[in-house]
Amino acid sequence: MERKKAVVLLSGGLDSSTVLAYAISLGYEVHAISFDYGQRHSREMNSSEELAKYYGVDRKIVHVDLRSIGKSALTDDIEVPSRDLESIPEEIPVTYVPARNTIFLSIAAAYAESIGSTDIFIGANAIDYSGYPDCRPEYFNAMEKALTLGTEIGLRKGMHINVPLQYLTKADIIRMGLKLGVPYEKTWSCYKGGEKACGECDSCLLRLKGFMEAGSEDPLEYEKYPTFYKDYIEKRKK
């Protein structure tokens, strides 16, 4: 019996790698898609390549020049804020890329339709989502309807956006990934483009907080470890 196909958005980050492993565990024939959109943290593209090879899945790279649109610290010469965990804002942060998920999901839907798939998986999260409007449940519900109405295969079978991490905390996601055997040492979350993760941007802080709350240690090396994580590691050693 032919396996059902699914397209998984694979950035190379912690969330998308967990979703990749999850979709594989469900028995899907997974086709990964990664986007080179001019992000300053291009290290994640290397991570997505490593993860695709690790899991033995096909990976399509799509180039989308979002730098030409601008207005994001992830693509422009806008400083990525360094702060502590308590100061992560609830409003839309400067790392928001205008309509990124809408663009990515539209392209993923086109790819899915081309291979006869009606399932798209994305690693978005509505709890530790750092204020992004295109990570909310109501957004994905609306986008799923649009892709169903806007594709030929959607009109026949329906298009499904699967967001399995939607209501999980970062700690829950990490626990899930560890059970699935996700090689988190191959992932990359930092918003900055250094050799090591910075340990100060929102993404690094949420990741380290997640590992701490999951009762595990992050296998990545950081330029700077926040005080809460250093205290946690010291307690683990005792």
Curated annotation (Swiss-Prot):
Keywords in alphabetical order: ATP-binding, Ligase, Metal-binding, Nucleotide-binding, Zinc
Pathway where this protein functions: Purine metabolism; 7-cyano-7-deazaguanine biosynthesis
Binding site residues for ATP: 10-20
InterPro entries cross-referenced by the UniProt entry: QueC, Rossmann-like_a/b/a_fold
Keyword Transmembrane helix appears in the UniProt entry: no
Coiled coil: none
Catalytic reactions on record: 7-carboxy-7-deazaguanine + NH4(+) + ATP = 7-cyano-7-deazaguanine + ADP + phosphate + H2O + H(+)
EC number: 6.3.4.20
Record-linked CDD domains: QueC-like
Entry note: cofactor: Binds 1 zinc ion per subunit.
Keyword hit for RNA-binding: no
GO molecular function terms listed in the Swiss-Prot or TrEMBL record: ATP binding; ligase activity, forming carbon-nitrogen bonds; zinc ion binding
Superkingdom: Archaea
Cofactors required: Zn(2+)
Binding site for Zn(2+): 190, 198, 201, 204
Similarity section: Belongs to the QueC family.
Protein purpose: Catalyzes the ATP-dependent conversion of 7-carboxy-7-deazaguanine (CDG) to 7-cyano-7-deazaguanine (preQ(0)).
NCBIfam families assigned to the protein according to its UniProt record, in alphabetical order: 7-cyano-7-deazaguanine synthase QueC
UniProt name for this protein: 7-cyano-7-deazaguanine synthase
Species this chain originates from: Thermoplasma acidophilum (strain ATCC 25905 / DSM 1728 / JCM 9062 / NBRC 15155 / AMRC-C165)
